[in-house]
């Protein structure tokens, strides 16, 4: 069952109105997608953060706009890098019976023996595209690294299969590796060359 999220329709998209909303702790946004034209809305910032924290980044939320109920996903969002606050959200209206595609975070689980042996763990891919019906979208995909030795690689083919969703990724793309540690270079010392003797003519004393 979708969690209810309170949104308010915006009557204007003028910059002054957007600034006012943000000063009041609200995030301007837009709803688009299934049975919905581009509808400008706003949502309370703290309420949105709490809803995502409690239900997950890929949760389905129920909103009401102009008396019409819609199921939406938090499709995209923008954050002010200086203030670390939400400044805009895109809410994608979805049909609960139709598959959608979204990014899902890849989480590494377990301890790699290669790391304990001094290897360096490097995660190359942090998110993958996943398609599923909205209520089946996973919050994360866990990848077990407990068998990785130095020199080992796990690819997109190693991501766990699940009947509820399909990972849309190129085959054999590297997700994580354990590489050998860099050898520390021995400091080298170079000896300064001996100064060469200068052979010149004997000078006559100046009177």
UniProtKB/Swiss-Prot annotation:
Keyword set, alphabetical order: Ribonucleoprotein, Ribosomal protein, RNA-binding, rRNA-binding
Compositionally biased region (Basic and acidic residues): 196-207
Region (Disordered): 171-207
GO MF term (any one): 5S rRNA binding
GO cellular component: cytosolic large ribosomal subunit
CDD domains according to UniProt: Ribosomal_L25_TL5_CTC (cd00495)
Top-rank taxon: Bacteria
A family per Pfam: Ribosomal_L25p
One Gene Ontology biological process: translation
Functional note: This is one of the proteins that binds to the 5S RNA in the ribosome where it forms part of the central protuberance.
Family: Belongs to the bacterial ribosomal protein bL25 family. CTC subfamily.
Quaternary structure and interacting proteins, as annotated: Part of the 50S ribosomal subunit; part of the 5S rRNA/L5/L18/L25 subcomplex. Contacts the 5S rRNA. Binds to the 5S rRNA independently of L5 and L18.
Protein name per the record: Large ribosomal subunit protein bL25
Encoding gene, per UniProt annotation: rplY
């Amino acid at each position: 069952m979708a969690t209810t999220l309170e949104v308010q329709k915006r009557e204007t998209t003028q910059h002054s109105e957007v600034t006012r909303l943000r000063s009041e702790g609200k995030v301007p946004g837009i709803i688009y997608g299934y049975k919905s034209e581009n509808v400008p809305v706003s949502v309370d910032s703290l309420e949105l953060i709490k809803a995502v924290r409690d239900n997950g980044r890929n949760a389905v939320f129920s909103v009401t706009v102009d008396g019409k109920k819609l199921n939406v996903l938090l499709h995209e969002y923008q954050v002010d890098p200086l203030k670390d606050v939400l400044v805009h959200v895109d809410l994608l209206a979805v049909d609960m019976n139709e598959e959608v595609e979204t990014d899902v975070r890849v989480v590494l689980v377990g301890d790699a023996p290669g790391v304990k042996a001094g290897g360096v763990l490097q995660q190359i891919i942090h998110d993958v595209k996943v398609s599923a019906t909205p209520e089946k979208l996973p919050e994360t995909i866990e990848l077990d690294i407990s068998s990785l030795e130095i020199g080992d690689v796990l690819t997109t083919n190693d991501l766990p299969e699940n009947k509820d969703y399909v990972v849309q990724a190129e085959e054999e793309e590297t997700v994580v590796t354990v590489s050998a540690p860099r050898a520390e270079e021995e400091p080298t010392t170079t000896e300064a060359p001996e100064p060469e003797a200068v052979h010149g003519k004997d000078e006559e004393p100046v009177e």
